[in-house]
Amino acid sequence: MKVRKLKNAEINLIEEELSKYTDKDFVKSFKYENLIVLEGKWLTVCYTNIETIKKLNMFQDIFSVGNVFGEIKRKFRLSLEGFTLISPNIINNYAIVNEKAEALFLYGRDIFKESIIEVKGFGRIAVFNKNREFLGIGLFDGKIIKNIKDKGWYLREGG
């Protein structure tokens, strides 16, 4: 895949997504210079260190580098690892669930409202356990958190 730096329009898409979950200060101070783009069927945004980015021109075809932070199709969507990276700073669009729901969610199951300790926001949300450890991504409709992808996915699917 071809590797390149982010374009300004792509940075704007990432800022827009980050602002759904974090505050303005985090969005402004985020290290966008640590992000690069892998061009394939769609644009994969990877987070890595500056030293690695400087050495990427030594390689012709790169399959992966650093952590996949998200993907750009029409919009930017944070990946599981992207959410993990920003999780200490998430203040909007999240849910905290009880222990039983945590276990079920990590097995790919959905979460019912009675298992939710705290929720802020609707739609695509970050899901945490009661210790505020990031578990995965869900879709909250006011009654159920539908599991989109969780940390247990790596073990179940061999990702």
Curated annotation (Swiss-Prot):
InterPro entries: NIP7_N, PUA_sf, UPF0113_PUA. It comes from Methanocaldococcus jannaschii (strain ATCC 43067 / DSM 2661 / JAL-1 / JCM 10045 / NBRC 100440) (Methanococcus jannaschii). Belongs to the UPF0113 family. Disulfide bonds: none annotated. Gene3D superfamilies: PUA domain (2.30.130.10). One of its GO terms (molecular function) is RNA binding. Coiled coil: none annotated. It holds the Pfam family pre-PUA_NIP7. This is UPF0113 protein MJ1410.
